[in-house]
A protein has these predicted regions:
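Accessory N-terminal region flanking or inserted into the helicase ATPase core
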Residues: 2-6, 17, 96-194, 201, ...
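Helicase P-loop NTPase motor core
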Residues: 1-4, 10-29, 37, 179-180, ...
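Structural preference for long, well-ordered alpha-helical segments in enzyme cores
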Residues: 18-22, 47, 95-96, 156, ...
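Structural recognition of the conserved hydrophobic beta-strand(s) that form the central parallel beta-sheet
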Residues: 33-35, 61, 191, 215-220
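Extended, H/D-rich, highly charged conserved domains that either
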Residues: 197-265
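Structural motif
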Residues: 7-10, 35-39, 192-197, 221-222, ...
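Conserved P-loop NTPase-based nucleic-acid remodeling module centered on helicase motor cores
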Residues: 28-132, 140
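A general structural motif
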Residues: 1, 28-30, 185-188, 213-215
Length: 322
């Protein structure tokens, strides 16, 4: 049982490093690569390419949600149906319609369903329950905040009472309670890649994976793993905290911490302007670019829609003309 951090700036080849290591051991040992949901298909494709399209019998790209589904089927507890995002929105809309006369702010607009849904998602991700909200509502002296919190408490309570399903965050809670009983991840090698950070739920799951797996490897986008006190002076502030928190988790559970892998050679930024920007953005002291920039442009948009339209038109122009 060990933890190894693989780190380097953006474009240093952290994912490539993982794919190459996996390809060397493909079908020799059980390997899992955990990625965010939106990266799963791309990761599978890249892994197949690195493995020369060999059958990946003992190697698998997986997400936390897919992992939860797998463990639930193995251990049990799959009686409740998963609640989709649209199903969650419909349920919240129904609750909002019934509770609108008791709410101070949230009942005035049906569009607040999105705000309520996103808030409940964040609460569950970071282990904030109804009692935590009540405690905050009782202690705050800001009446505006108190009223908004009371609205959210009402919606959260009704949501928990009404729900006969499992939403995406409940699934991870169940995974967290069941994963140590699972045999699927024992003595395996795990790579965790492409995450910009982890929620409280995910940290807890990773801590348990450290106790099960032979080795857990995590990629982190940062220039070093030294703690930085001033977030305004370090673009990698949050990422460094992620690395430090993982190290502390490993120490807490008596997990061996292997030597870090630091990658320094930039592969992605062949353009000198972008390379200079990446190296000096937030750097103290910074270096001034001596040449006139030709590949970096600034555009002040009125809103996100005009920003997207401008970017799309620029892409079309570059593809057609350059």
């Amino acid at each position: 049982m060990s933890l190894r951090l693989i780190y380097g700036k953006s474009g240093c080849g952290k994912s490539e490093y993982c794919f190459k290591e996996i390809a060397k051991n493909v079908n020799k040992e059980k390997i899992y690569m955990i990625v965010p949901n939106q990266m799963a298909l791309m990761a599978e494709k890249r892994l197949m390419e690195k493995a020369d399209n060999l059958g990946l019998v003992n190697t698998e790209v997986i997400t936390f949600s897919r992992m939860a589904f797998r463990v639930r089927n193995e251990i049990g507890g799959a009686k409740k149906t998963n609640l989709s995002k649209s199903g969650k929105a419909m349920l919240l809309y129904d609750i909002l319609s019934k509770q609108k006369d008791t709410l101070n702010f949230l009942g005035k607009n049906a569009e607040n369903v999105d705000i309520i849904g996103n808030s409940i998602t964040e609460f569950k991700k970071h282990r904030i329950d109804i009692e935590n909200l009540k405690e905050e509502a009782n202690t705050t002296t800001d009446m505006y905040l108190k009223l908004k919190l009371n609205d959210m408490i009402t919606m959260y309570e009704e949501f928990e009472k009404s729900i006969q399903f499992l939403d995406e965050n409940d699934v991870l809670d169940i995974l967290n309670t069941q994963i140590l009983e699972s045999n699927q991840f024992k003595n395996t090698t795990i790579y965790i890649d492409e995450f910009v950070g982890f929620t409280t739920q995910e940290y807890e799951i990773i801590a348990k994976l450290m106790q099960l797996a032979k080795e857990v490897n995590v990629t982190i986008c940062t220039d070093n793993l030294l703690q930085q006190e001033d977030a305004d002076k370090d673009i990698f502030y949050a990422n460094k905290n992620t690395g430090i928190k993982l190290i502390n988790l490993a120490k807490e559970y008596g997990i061996e911490i292997e030597d870090d892998v630091k990658l320094t050679e930039l592969h992605r930024f062949k353009n000198e302007e972008l390379k200079h920007l990446e190296e000096n953005f937030y750097a103290v002291p910074y270096k001034t670019y001596k040449e006139e920039p030709k590949n970096i442009k600034m555009f002040l948009a009125n809103n996100q829609y005009t920003e997207i339209e401008h970017i799309a038109s620029e892409i079309v122009k570059l593809v057609r003309n350059e």
